[in-house]
Regions:
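Microtubule-binding structural modules
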Residues: 1-130
Length: 130
């Protein structure tokens, strides 16, 4: 499934495009399992992160700035998953539009330089939402 869906998105990212990997479905339909995977089977996020950093290493003639955000839309509310649940706004975050396109106001973005950093952020969210 990863090769058919997310692999091309990572190639576009390395080419300079802003990209998003988005999981959609009913509650308990397997979105979290598909995205995170298990201890023995890497999920979409893990494979994408590894592919991204491998591609960066293979492109030494370019400089990359990588930011990571992680959010969910649940019951029509946008929640920042990199934010402690206690400090989230009660009504969720707002989706806005400007001349550059759509964005989520106040969504945390973390600058990252390694796959390990992203995995640490994800581990924090797994602990908060498990």
């Amino acid at each position: 499934m990863y090769i058919d869906t997310a692999s091309d998105i990572i190639e576009q990212t390395v080419s300079g495009f802003n990209t998003t990997i988005f999981a959609y479905g009913q509650t308990s339909s397997g979105k979290t399992h598909t995205m995170y995977g298990t201890a023995s089977e890497t999920g979409v996020i893990g494979m994408a992160v590894e592919q991204l950093f491998h591609a960066v290493e293979e492109t030494p003639d370019r400089r990359f700035l990588m930011n990571v955000s992680y959010m969910e839309i649940y019951n029509e509310m946008v929640n920042d998953l990199l934010c402690d649940s206690k400090s989230r706004p009660a009504g969720g975050l707002k989706v806005r539009e400007n001349e550059e396109g759509f964005y989520v106001e106040d969504l945390i973005q973390k600058t990252v330089t390694s796959a390990e950093e992203i995995h640490r952020y994800l581990l924090c969210t797994i602990r908060l939402y498990s």
